[in-house]
């Protein structure tokens, strides 16, 4: 039997404009980490999300690293950060010799819990040891609840940095995540809703901060005719060729969001009657892009856990992936403090990301949904049969243990001797 075509989790989806812009870069010989496409990409990105200033960089990780440096994070500082995230949100904290303190999620959006963050900041304020910054991660295409987080940071004068690497196209009360904190980081990795193959963007309303970021990303070279350096810099600039790809991608952002939200709606309709399956909620405060459509699976009700389902789908050449393993459960961060943790732990124990690419066809989505439904129904039926077998065996066992009246007692028709004679 032929193996069906593989359905990937979140593959790149090109618009056709990318080739036009890349060809321009080659024809004009602008293939270095500077050029007209870089400048245009930065300008168009700002226009798209409502930011004032931006610098294109080599990755989302680079953007977070620069943001932390610009926030003044140094060795020995503490930085509060979401625990339910990818390691790239946290690694730059360690690059700088600072200590991450992980903050658990809340149930409504799966993002950082504002109440836990506020309590943590109050505690540190009483000790006179406030963190240098808060790195707020917006997960799977959905904004965190920003208002109370912004208020808590402002109350204690702690710099808020936004990791919006998964949230391009989402909204919070009409605003774009990544534009509300002091600095916002974005990623254009190959699996993102907009990709440059690899790349990132750092945005801010503070022009001086972005100018400094641009300098640091270009090996901190001073504006001199010779190579002059007064601080340590990095090779973090994005090439003109990759920026050309980004321009072609950014032009179709809205259609990509529409397609991913359509994926979610089709999954939800197809799996509505499957018990034990719940979709990541969409918080009331804004638009979820459904960058990933994510479900949680109750093994007691569904008869299958998230890993069983993942393996069953893999056997049908369908790629899925567990949700982020919380950072406080990662061996490399074993000694770090975590505020809460139960929500992120529960999500990791039950969560699964379904194929979510904007190029998926209705046939692809139906194939995935059918495979999920079939797996759960088959496992549930198998479990029901096993339960019946166990009950029958238990009944037979109980019967075998009951006393035999012909052995332990006298039959009623047997006449007993009268011992009084």
Q: What would you call each of these model-derived segments?
A:
Residues 1-31, 355, 416, 420:
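N-terminal "arm"/small-domain region of PLP-dependent enzymes with the aminotransferase-like
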Residues 31-78, 92-94, 102-104, 126, ...:
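Phosphate-binding glycine-rich loop
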Residues 36-43, 48-54, 115, 119, ...:
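PLP-dependent aminotransferase class I/II
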Residues 85-90:
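Conserved coil-to-alpha-helix start sites within the AMP-binding
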Residues 91-93, 152, 193, 241:
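Hydrophobic/aromatic ligand-binding patch that stacks against planar heteroaromatic rings
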Residues 97:
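Structured binding elements
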Residues 108-196, 201-203:
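Active-site phosphate-binding strand-loop segment of PLP-dependent enzymes
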């Amino acid at each position: 039997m032929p193996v069906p075509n593989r359905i990937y989790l979140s593959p790149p989806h090109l618009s056709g404009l990318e080739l036009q812009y890349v060809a321009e870069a080659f024809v004009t010989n602008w293939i270095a980490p500077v050029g007209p496409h870089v400048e245009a990409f930065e300008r168009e990105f700002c226009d798209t999300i409502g930011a004032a200033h931006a610098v294109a960089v080599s990755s989302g990780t680079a953007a977070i690293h620069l943001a932390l440096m610009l926030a003044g994070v140094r060795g020995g500082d503490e930085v509060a950060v979401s625990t339910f995230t990818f390691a790239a949100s946290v690694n730059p904290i360690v690059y700088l010799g600072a200590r991450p303190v992980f903050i658990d999620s809340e149930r409504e959006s799966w993002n950082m819990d504002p109440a836990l963050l506020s309590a943590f900041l109050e505690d540190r304020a009483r000790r006179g040891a406030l963190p240098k910054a808060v790195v707020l991660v917006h997960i799977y295409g959905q904004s965190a609840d920003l208002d109370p987080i912004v208020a808590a940071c402002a109350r204690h004068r702690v710099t808020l940095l936004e990791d919006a690497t998964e949230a391009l196209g989402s909204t919070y009360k009409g605003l774009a995540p990544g534009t509300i904190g002091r600095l916002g980081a974005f990623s254009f990795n190959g699996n993102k809703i907009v990709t440059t193959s690899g790349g990132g963007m750092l945005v801010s309303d503070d022009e001086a901060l972005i100018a400094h970021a641009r300098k640091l990303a270009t090996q901190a070279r001073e504006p001199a005719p010779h190579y002059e350096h007064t601080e340590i810099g990095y090779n973090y600039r994005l090439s003109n060729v990759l920026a050309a790809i980004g321009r072609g991608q950014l032009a179709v952002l809205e259609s990509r969001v529409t397609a991913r939200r359509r994926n979610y709606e089709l999954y939800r309709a197809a799996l509505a009657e499957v018990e034990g399956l719940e979709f990541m909620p969409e918080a009331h405060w804004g638009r979820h892009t459904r960058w990933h459509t994510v479900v949680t699976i109750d093994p007691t009700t569904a008869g299958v856990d998230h890993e069983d389902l993942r393996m069953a789908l893999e056997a049908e050449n369908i790629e899925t992936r567990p949700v982020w393993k919380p950072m406080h459960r990662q061996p490399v961060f074993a000694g770090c403090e975590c505020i809460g943790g139960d929500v992120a732990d529960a999500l990791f124990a039950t969560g699964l990301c379904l194929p979510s690419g904007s190029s998926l066809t209705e046939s692809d989505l139906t194939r995935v949904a059918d495979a999920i439904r079939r797996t759960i129904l088959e496992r549930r039926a198998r479990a029901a049969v096993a339960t019946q077998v166990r009950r029958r065996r238990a009944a037979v066992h109980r019967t075998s243990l009951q006393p035999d009246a012909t052995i332990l007692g006298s039959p009623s028709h047997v006449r007993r001797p009268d011992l009084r004679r």
